Regions:
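Short, solvent-exposed amphipathic alpha-helical segments in soluble enzyme
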Residues: 43-48, 69-73, 122-127, 151-152, ...
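Short secondary-structure transition/capping segments
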Residues: 69-70, 89-90, 147-151, 167-169, ...
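Alpha-helix boundary/capping detector
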Residues: 75-81, 92, 153, 172-173, ...
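A contiguous loop/helix-start segment that scaffolds small-molecule binding in enzyme catalytic cores
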Residues: 1-28, 101-106, 162, 167-246
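Class I S-adenosyl-L-methionine
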Residues: 1-38, 43-140, 145, 240
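Class I SAM-dependent methyltransferase SAM-binding "motif I" and its flanking Rossmann-like core
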Residues: 111-187, 230-233
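Short, functionally important structural connectors and interaction interfaces within domains
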Residues: 32-33, 52, 57, 84, ...
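Short hydrophobic/aromatic-enriched beta-strand-loop microsegments
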Residues: 73-80, 131-135, 154-164, 211-220
Length: 246
């Protein structure tokens, strides 16, 4: 198995930096691991994993991809569990920069796509400020893949000509929420809510209050594209209660 570093050390935010004299600067690749099934990583993403000296991985990354790393690879666990112990983004940025400045080929492996609720943009900026070359490898994103695996097309001729992806991490009435739920309720297309199970009752209440049809078909997909996938089909009016009793 790869060399495993269970957590990153708590240090300050990354600023600039430079490689030691006479040592080449390494590189960082922000790689999307896909929605859960390890076979859904891109060909390029898998190749970069095979070439990496250091892999910094999140909780949502398929374990099989990590088990296949070369024995000498340093695996840094950047687990970010919602509402629990977490490596701060500044710590993760610091590890990426530090390892690359030491000459390593670093892969930042993230569930789904690096730029879809993955803070890939913040990591790109941290590396750019330190003068480190960055490659971005898009990943198959769960807002499309999970519905597809459940047999639900996000667009369908004559039914949905658009789909919208939003975070459900914050409830609709939270002061930090940037989501316009009133506007979403007026749309006719498919609405995909990520990280929304905890706040599902308040999300449903907001959409209904703003006029979304209570008979709108609704589904909850858990562990999409994996062997543990579960799908609940319902309507907007009843999905919160159905999910609670499932």
């Amino acid at each position: 198995p790869a060399v495993r570093v269970e957590t990153v050390e708590p240090v300050g935010a990354v600023g600039g930096g430079s490689a030691p004299a006479g040592r080449r600067v390494g590189s960082v690749a922000l790689v999307g691991a896909g929605p859960g099934d390890p076979e859904l990583i891109t060909v390029r993403g898998r190749r970069l994993l095979a070439e990496a000296d250091v892999v910094v991985a999140d909780r949502l990354v398929p374990r099989l991809l990590l088990d296949e790393l070369r024995p000498e690879v340093e695996l840094v666990d950047a687990t970010k569990i919602p509402h629990g112990p977490a490596a701060t983004q500044e710590e993760i940025n610091r590890v990426l920069v530090e390892r690359a400045l030491a000459g390593a080929t670093v892969v930042r492996l993230k569930g789904g796509d690096p730029y879809v609720f993955g803070r890939g943009g913040e990591e790109l900026l941290a590396c750019a400020e330190a003068g480190i070359p960055v490659t971005v490898v898009p990943g198959v994103s769960s807002p499309i893949a999970a519905p597809a695996a459940a047999g639900i097309p996000v667009t369908h001729r004559g039914v949905a000509h658009e789909f919208t992806v939003v975070s459900g991490h914050l409830p609709p009435d939270h002061p930090d929420s940037l989501v316009d739920w009133a506007a979403l309720a007026r749309l006719r297309g498919t609405l995909v809510v990520l990280m929304g199970l905890t706040n599902l009752p308040s999300i449903v209440a907001a959409l209904l209050a703003y006029g979304r049809d209570p008979d709108t078909p609704a589904a909850v997909v858990q562990e999409g594209t994996t062997g543990a996938q579960r799908v609940l089909r319902s309507t907007l009016a009843t999905v919160a209660a159905d999910a609670r009793s499932a």
